[in-house]
Amino acid sequence: MPFVQRYSDVKKGAIIFAGNTLGLSKAANSNSPGTEGSIGAFTSLNTSLQVGNFPAGTTLDYTLNGSRAQLSLPAGSSVLYAELVWGGLYRSTVNNISNLINNPVVFSTPLSANVQIAPDAATSQDFVITVDNVTVGFYVRSANVTALVAAALSGAYSVQRVPALIEAIDSRTSQTNHAGWTLAVVYENQTLDLRNLTLWSGGNVVSPSTGSTTVTVTNFLTPVSYTHLRAH
């Protein structure tokens, strides 16, 4: 079940996304800054923490990780649905934290601080793949956070305590250390066009070893004639 439909309606409105990484790129075989495309340290909202030569606000402890993003809704908007999605690397050749990936994460809105958000089993997905003869595991979790976002609307949002592994030795993960989050918000605004607003949640793996991937969605309808037909 790569993707699960979470919301669908026809309204004057749109879908907007906010989110952030939870780590900074590493150097080869080291927890130091570099350009390997694999994270070497988590970001943290605590700027008194620092990992080596990484900037302040970094940690190797997932329970201290965190990042912020700005949600900007047009004036006069109301939130119809909001989904928080997060994930990361949970398995390397030497470590496996599958016992932690269903733990709640900490979500803060402009109005509510440090709310524990438990993942919804309906959208929980784990992926085990082999990259360059290295077997690794990724996961995706999500939850409905509509009430929190509808109350807070625009402003700074943050997510903390997302379980994930960081391995310094690249051969343990084939350079796939990662962690991050996305907030998907479906909103209504009477100044916008009438649209079919449908949101799916889930994940799929795309890598050099797996090649391209095809995602099938159902019940997707379009007008017979429309000059501005778009999808995201």
Regions from the PLM with identified roles:
Residues R68-S78, A147-V149, Y187, V215-Y226:
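Extracellular and analogous surface-interaction loops
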Residues G88-I97:
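Extended, low-complexity, turn-rich repeat/linker tracts enriched in Gly/Pro/Ser/Thr and Asp/Glu
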Residues P104-S174:
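Cysteine-clustered segments with highest specificity for TGF-beta superfamily mature ligands
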Residues E167-V205:
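Exposed low-complexity, polar/acidic, P/S/T/G-rich flexible segments that act as propeptides
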Residues M1-A27, L194-L199:
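Boundary/junction segments of secreted and surface-exposed precursor proteins
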Residues T227-H232:
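Conserved small/polar residues in nucleotide/adenosyl-binding loops
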Residues S32-E83, T214-V215:
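A short beta-strand-loop element at or near the start of a globular domain
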Residues G66-R68, V79-Y81, L100-P104, S154-A156, ...:
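Extracellular structured ligand-interaction cores
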